[in-house]
Amino acid sequence: MAVQMAAELEMAADIVLGPPNLVSAEQRATAESIFINFRKSVCPYTMCKELLETSKNDYVLFEASGLIKDALIREWNELPAQDIHALRTYLLQYVISNPSCSAFVRERIVQVIAIMVKRQSVEDGGKDRSLVIAEVQQLIASGNQQMQMMGCAIITALMQEYATTVKSSDVGLPWELHFKVKKQFESTDLQTIFRFSISALKELSAQIVLPLNSDMEYLLRRLVMISETVLSWTFINVNLPKKLISVFESDQSPSLRPGVAWKEILLEPSLVPFIFDFHWRVRSSSSISHHTLSCLVQLASLNGQTLNAKNLRLEHLTTYIRSLTQLIENISRTASIPGKEALGISTIVRKLILFYPPNILVNIEGELLQKYLEQLVSLTCGFLRASLSPGTDEEEQLLFNEVSNLLQRRKNFRLIFILGI
């Protein structure tokens, strides 16, 4: 039956995807009706698994995995726990065993796994999720680049499912439960993911040889994007009304404001210096450096319960400015700074001034502060000089943003100089 079903669906897929000059409107409508009826199938898990095993048509594989997703959401409460676990295990092993399957098919199956894990975490408190993440960590640590990329895809899908509460509606849960499981995820496995992503980047940074080959560049980019997602996470510590949560989650550049449980992780002394060093190593790769700069911008905005004492704020600021001045010094030796990197650095400065006002800034070591301020003056003058040179509209807009970032808080700098620094 599975062979017959696969043949019928594959024929319909060829018609649906066929060019208009070879497929009549009637043929296309008939083929589309086959998939419409297919999507209505009840308890289709065995049939879909057989299709995944036998069909070589990507469109059929995509539809089969989509049907699993829709059926799971619809029938979750009727399914025995052991059947759910067996299906999740099967899907995970399927994507691991078929690393060469089409990207859009893989992403759909990975999304189904993430939805299952999130839905299960409502009932088991995240136990199954922790098992999945542990298994995925082994993939990333395996040294096999295909398995590492697969592991990154699964982690990314999990994070996407937990990242928002208001917009998450495709797992059959009310938004209040989305909020509950998101908080549960933040306090446990999100920390595990961040620690592991940084650890993997540290290990891989020693293997960086420029120019990067495509596989290494892709893997590094996915790992940095995982770290970036954590550092850009919308941490909401109280159960606010849905409309207010929507406002927070719509913020495109939220500050980094985690709970006190993140103190040990984010204030680890080597974290900030490592990310600055890693950015310096990969700055020639625009596909990665964009994300490393985003990580650094977010760390510049660190505030809240993690820095609940003045000495902690001062220590973090000192560590950050020391690493920043070293980066600027290294860049100055090259006598070249790409526009997007310049914009990133100016955004970092703007965030530092915004979250660490003069009454904090003046307390860092005098020599370091003097060096930092001199570099800011030099950068501002350099950007202004560059703005006088002819360039493209994009370059001119970048320069305008860079100068605006550096001059936006000029009153704060004036106060620092008045205080005698």
Predicted regions and their residues:
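Hydrophobic residues within the alpha-helices of tandem HEAT/HEAT-like
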Residues: 16, 35-39, 67-75, 112-120, ...
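Short inter-helical turns and helix N-cap capping residues of alpha-solenoid HEAT/ARM repeat scaffolds
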Residues: 20-24, 56-57, 99-102, 143-144, ...
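Amphipathic alpha-helical segments within extended alpha-helical solenoids and repeat-rich scaffolds
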Residues: 2-8, 39-46, 81-100, 125-146, ...
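Hydrophobic or amphipathic alpha-helical targeting/insertion segments
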Residues: 93, 101-123, 147-154
